[in-house]
Amino acid sequence: YDRVGLDETIVVTRSNKRANIFNQGIRNQILYREEELTAGDLLLVAKNNYFWGKDYKEVDFIANGDVARVVRVLKRTDMYGFRFADVQLYFPDLEVEMEVKILLDTLTSESPSLTREQQETLFAQVLADYYDVTTKREKMKRLKTDPWFNALQVKYAYGVTCHKAQGGQWKHVYVDMGYIPQGAVSLDFYRWLYTAFT
């Protein structure tokens, strides 16, 4: 990190579980960050989002794989059985800073984004707030404009899966192959390794 900085260094690994281990290690042992989220943290968007970019002419949508730097953590809230934070993020590739609501639950999740079950729970909980809306169409319209339902799903961006790293470019890339048992090296492994290198 001293040589090329946080923005130009990444660990590419095979699973979200391994990415979480690297992210926690890098945040705690190298960056000395103990809080869950702090200014300066690098985040990776885990799911396309069309809600938060709508007020910015230079942003069509925030794409899965976009990287953002936390400028400020404004407020944390527990709602609908999930943890959220209002944060100010800077997106270097988009060259825009925006205030968004993020889901903290996805930061260390072993799934790529909210699981189907979690997504359904959030959907049902937010939809319940619109009990007074009589038509299904109007409820769906409200849901599309609800900041809680449309919270940005993010992960830490220090260690990521090969899938999430695709299309990115860094000066220093560390490829973690993890433990490879005897005989586990297959064509699939070599394909993954090729993708990681390219």
Give the positions of each predicted feature:
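Conserved interdomain hinge at the start of the Helicase C-terminal
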Residues: 1-7
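Core RecA-like ATPase module of SF1/SF2 helicases and allied nucleic-acid translocases
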Residues: 7-198
